Amino acid sequence: MEVDKNLAENFYKKDLVKIVYLLDELNKDKYTKHILRFLANENIELGSEVLAAKLATDISRFDFAIQVSKIASYQKRFHNKYNYPIISTPKYINKRKIPEAAFILSIIRQESEFDTSANSSAGARGLMQLMTYTAKTVAKQANMTYSKSRLTKDPEYNINLGSHYIAGLILEYDGAYPVSYTHLTL
């Protein structure tokens, strides 16, 4: 959806938008998701959902952009640019070829919706929802230092470990992605 330039300019002048940026700077995003949802619903027909999702992306909260976009998709309004974020993924880790970015990103979206601080009730952590035991094992295999705190604080670290693990499964199952995916217990 193309958003009117004047609407976009007025959107970014709003106090709530300034508050979202301030909360991001202060690393205090407890209320950010609620503010973004409010902003998304202000004027849907003119593009408030797109602007709210873009704002979430601007502050690197892809998880919030996905949530806004998902809600819109239930009403047949599709904002795929924000519903399926694209971030950098490795090509090789310790000489192991990593699957293409689209595969890694689809796993991240399914597992955590791009929430870097995600913690599951089972104990899985970060973007790729790595279990601590798996992360320790993979870190050793990849010649990386294991750090439990980095699983939720360092997205690149989490993606590197998870990608290395997935690449190993694909090798183990002779390149069969579907079989590898069904054996995925990050």
Language model regions located:
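Conserved small/polar residues in nucleotide/adenosyl-binding loops
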Residues: 182-186
